[in-house]
Structures are given as structure tokens and as C-alpha cells.
């Protein structure tokens, strides 16, 4: 099974402009994500998909594989689909470009054991605090007994009316798709649920497509604000001092 990771990266961000190129210990944030994913033994190639000439230039300078996509890609999944048109793989793994300390072993967990019957998968992690549950940037998810997604929401789901004894989950920005799944997404218009929640994955759910949810123990450290960036910089500096990270 040939698995290729693609990191969608756009320069414009509603919360942190130019985020992929912001420096962390002398390297762009996107470089750190790329290097972490490259450590995976089950990923054959890692690519960046972007519409930014500045990001493309950085990738060339740092010998990172890069594909240019159109400037009007409405979603990261659409950008992934565009890049996949010229990149051969059995499974395409989408990795968010704003988690510079992402664990490569966690990324591997989204890969299927076999291709037969596989369509798409998404990692999810337990929510550990009420603040996480009510934060609309954390997309909550519930799954059926077979592990397929039932619904995604920016609101806490399910609502704890009958009991408080429930482990809530949030989706992580690591997904795996077959070419069939990406083609379906690219050629299917948004449904009303996706429009109101602004969650890409609902496009599969609304049309009854299987999206396997895989629970992992991971505390994601995504960079969405200047405060997040400062925190990650401190963590990277500490890991460099301890020899847990190496700049090459």
C-alpha cells in the first residue's frame, strides 16, 4: 500500500496571517510539520500543497516536495484533491500544517490495515476539559458502534441531559482518503449541515459515506494565535536542548 502525506498550506489565515512561514527556532513552522511527518516509516512521500509562491519558494529552498494548487480552493480537502491529481498513491493522508510537533506515530494510526472496503478515516482524541468542549474551534464528533462518524459539530455533542458520564471526542486534523473519497468530495456540493457547521467532514456524513473515526491518545498543539506560537517555540527550544529534536 502506497501512502502519501499531503500538507495543505495557505498563506492567508483568518487568525494568523502567514502562519506556515512563521519561524520556530530558525525554521518555518511548515518545515517542522514536514520533518515530523517524514519520520513515519509507513508514509512513502510527504508533499506540501499550496497556492502561495512564497511557500513554494521556501519548499524549494529547503528541498521539500511541493505542488501548486489554484488560489480559489475553498477547503483543505479540495486542495488535497487538486494535488492528488498528479501524485500517485493508494491512500492520501491529510495533515494540518499548523502542528509543528505532531507525532509521526499518531499520523500512522489513520492508515488502514488493508485497502479492501476502505473509503476514508479521521483521528479523534478525548476532550479533557469543559473549556475544550465549548471551544468552537474544537470540532466535536460522535460515532456509531462500528466506529463510523455520525455527526460533527462545533457545539458539545451529545448534550448531557440524561447523564454526565460520557467521554467527549474532538476530531484531529489527520485524515486518510482513497482517491475515490477525494473525487466524491470534490464533485459533491456542500449540504445544509456542512454549510451551517462549516465542517468539511459532514459532506461524507450527509451522503451516508463511511468515515471511520479512530481514537488516539494525543494532545494536539495547533498554532492558531500568537500565544500558541510563543508556547510552541518554548517547547521546541526545550526539546532541542534535550536532544529530542534535531535541526538538519
Give each language-model segment a name:
Residues 2-49:
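N-terminal glycine-rich phosphate-binding loop and ensuing alpha1 helix
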Residues 4, 47, 99, 140, ...:
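A residue-level structural signature of the nucleotidyltransferase/glycosyltransferase Rossmann-like core
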Residues 5, 46-48, 92, 121, ...:
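Hydrophobic/aromatic residues located in beta-strands of well-ordered beta-sheets
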Residues 43, 89, 116-119:
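Short, high-confidence coil segments that cap the C-terminus of an alpha-helix
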Residues 47, 53-112:
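Short phosphate-binding loop-to-helix
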Residues 50-51, 102, 177, 224:
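A conserved hydrophobic position in a structured secondary element of the catalytic/binding core
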Residues 102-191:
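Conserved core of the sugar-phosphate nucleotidyltransferase
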Residues 166-248:
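Conserved alpha/beta core of the MobA/IspD/sugar-nucleotide pyrophosphorylase nucleotidyltransferase superfamily
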Amino acid at each position: 500500500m502506497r501512502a502519501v502525506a499531503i500538507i495543505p498550506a495557505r498563506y492567508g489565515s483568518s487568525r494568523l496571517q502567514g502562519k506556515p512561514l512563521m519561524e520556530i527556532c530558525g525554521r518555518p513552522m511548515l518545515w517542522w510539520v514536514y520533518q515530523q511527518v517524514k519520520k513515519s516509516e509507513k508514509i512513502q512521500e510527504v508533499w506540501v500543497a499550496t497556492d502561495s509562491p512564497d511557500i513554494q519558494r521556501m519548499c524549494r529552498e529547503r528541498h521539500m516536495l511541493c505542488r501548486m494548487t489554484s488560489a480559489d480552493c475553498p477547503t483543505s480537502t479540495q486542495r488535497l484533491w487538486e494535488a492528488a491529481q498528479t501524485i500517485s498513491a493508494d491512500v492520501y493522508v491529510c495533515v494540518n500544517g499548523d502542528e509543528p510537533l505532531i507525532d509521526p506515530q499518531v499520523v500512522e494510526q489513520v492508515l488502514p490495515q488493508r485497502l479492501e472496503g476502505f473509503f476514508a478515516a479521521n483521528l479523534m482524541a478525548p476532550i479533557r476539559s469543559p473549556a475544550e468542549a465549548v471551544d468552537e474551534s474544537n470540532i466535536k464528533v460522535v460515532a456509531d458502534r462500528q466506529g463510523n462518524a455520525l455527526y460533527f459539530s462545533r457545539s458539545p455533542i451529545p448534550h448531557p441531559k440524561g447523564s454526565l458520564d460520557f467521554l467527549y471526542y474532538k476530531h484531529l486534523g489527520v485524515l486518510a482518503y482513497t482517491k475515490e473519497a477525494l473525487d466524491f468530495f470534490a464533485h459533491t456540493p456542500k449540504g445544509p449541515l456542512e454549510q451551517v457547521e462549516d465542517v468539511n467532514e459532514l459532506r461524507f456524513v450527509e451522503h451516508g459515506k463511511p468515515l471511520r473515526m479512530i481514537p488516539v491518545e494525543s494532545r494536539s498543539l495547533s498554532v492558531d494565535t500568537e500565544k500558541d506560537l510563543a508556547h510552541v517555540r518554548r517547547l521546541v527550544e526545550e526539546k532541542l536542548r534535550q536532544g529530542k529534536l534535531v535541526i538538519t
